[in-house]
Regions:
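N-terminal alpha-helical scaffold/docking segments in eukaryotic complex subunits
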Residues: 1-49
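Alpha-solenoid HEAT/ARM repeat scaffold
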Residues: 5, 35, 39, 70-71, ...
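Residues within HEAT/ARM-like alpha-solenoid scaffolds
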Residues: 6, 29-32, 36, 48, ...
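Amphipathic alpha-helical repeat scaffolds
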Residues: 8-9, 23-27, 38-42, 57-58, ...
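Amphipathic alpha-helical scaffolding segments comprising HEAT/armadillo-like alpha-solenoid repeats
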Residues: 14-26, 47-62, 81-93, 114-137, ...
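Alpha-helix N-cap/helix-start positions at coil->helix boundaries
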Residues: 31-35, 66-67, 82, 98-99, ...
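Hydrophobic residues within the alpha-helices of tandem HEAT/HEAT-like
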Residues: 37, 41, 107-113, 155-157
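Structural signature of alpha-helical solenoid repeat scaffolds
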Residues: 42, 77, 109-110, 153, ...
């Protein structure tokens, strides 16, 4: 049975006494109800950025259930709170579930960006980059390593550009999409020609990612091509073009 919708807002900005009550109650809530609660909170969180379900997510990212962990990471990353960087690094490197590791690696992207614009302590920034590079160069599942590459797109570390080039030239559409995502995250015009040439790729998700990257990099010369892509047969491509 789901939590009554009218009570869901009460999970936002919990007072200390309410947080303590939640900590005591959490183990008694069935895994299915925990997932249902977090799905509802995620929906609310997306609709209203004034809400904060940090206290619930703090429990969720310590949970034993992969889906609970996944939703906890998804919501918590939106708040960009540096105190959870260590948790995200630990999950990205050590959680037993690949989807959780991938989500946590992706969550580190925002902090990589914050470090680049001097809003994190340099040692913290380096720790994040080191963790992501370690994941990228590991034998982990492709999805986890690809999320690490995308997060590293924000980084100016010298190891990053060769890694993007390698993924771009891999011939694997998934790695190509991640390379384009990283290029967009870098906002570096050096990637301009490599992005534009992918507007005509046979794979629609590649075309969509290339369109998004063109917007991130602000490639003015790509505008005529992007306008033509508004007639693309694929909805994802058209949506990406409209965003760009």
């Amino acid at each position: 049975e789901p939590f009554p919708p009218r009570y869901l807002h009460r999970f936002s900005d919990l007072l200390e006494e309410d947080s303590l009550s939640l900590i005591q109650a959490w183990p008694k809530i069935s895994p299915l109800r925990r997932v249902a609660l977090l799905e509802d909170l995620d929906e609310l969180n997306q609709a209203d950025d004034l809400l904060s379900f940090e206290e619930v997510c703090k429990l969720a990212i310590k949970d034993s259930q992969a889906q609970v962990l996944l939703l906890g990471v998804k919501i918590l990353k939106e708040y960009e709170l540096p105190q959870y960087i260590s948790d995200f690094i630990h999950l990205a490197k050590h959680d037993s579930d690949g989807a959780v590791r991938a989500a946590a690696a992706g969550a580190l992207g925002a902090f990589t960006y914050l470090g680049e614009v001097d809003k994190l302590h340099p040692s913290t920034h380096q720790r994040i980059e080191d963790a992501l590079l370690s994941i990228l160069n590991s034998q982990d599942e492709s999805i986890v390593r690809r999320r690490a590459l995308e997060a590293l797109g924000y980084s100016s570390r010298e190891e990053v550009n060769p890694a993007i080039e390698l993924a771009y030239a891999s011939g694997d559409p998934d790695w190509l999409i991640s390379a384009l995502n990283a290029m967009g995250n870098s906002a570096d015009s050096k990637w301009k020609s490599k992005v534009i040439v992918m507007f005509d790729h046979q794979h629609p998700l590649v075309r969509a990612e290339a369109a998004s990257a063109a917007g991130e990099i602000e490639i003015i010369s790509a505008v005529p091509s992007l306008l033509r892509m508004l007639d693309d047969v694929d909805l994802d491509v058209r949506m990406a073009v409209m965003w760009s």
